[in-house]
Amino acid sequence: MRPRSLRSALTGLAASTAIALAWPAMAEVVNLKAPMNATNQVPPNSSKGTGTLTATYDTASKKLSWKGSYSDLTGSATAAHFHSGEPGKNGGVAVPIAPATSPLEGSATLTDAQATDLLAGKWYVNVHTDANKGGEIRGQVTK
C-alpha cells in the first residue's frame, strides 16, 4: 500500500472509531420526579392524599421507567396516568399506569413527541378515585 493510501485508510479508521466510541456518550438517562398532592390537581380538592413518583428516561431506548407510591386517599385508586399538560392545565392521557395500586411501577416506550414534552416539563402524573374522578392527587414531572 502506498503511504498516501495508508494515511487515508488510517484517517478513515480513526474517524470511524471516534464516532463509534462517542455514540454511547450521546445517550443519556434522565432522572425525573413528581411529588403528588391534591392542591396540584386542576381544580384542587381537599384530599389529604400525597404521593411521590420517581422515573428515569433513557434517551437511547426511549424507555420511561417509574416507581411511586401514595397514601391517605379518600378511597381506593381507580386509575393512574401520565398526562400531557403544563402546570395548571389539564391534558389527555399519555401513558396509563396499571395497576393503579400503590406502589406504582412500570415502564413504557415513548414516541419522539412524547419524549419532547416529557423532558420539557409538559407531563404530569395523577391518581384517580371514585370521590375525585378527574384526579385526586397530581404531580408535575420534572428533572
Please place each PLM-identified region on the residue numbering.
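Metal-centered catalytic cores of metalloenzymes
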Residues: 2-5, 12, 17, 21-80, ...
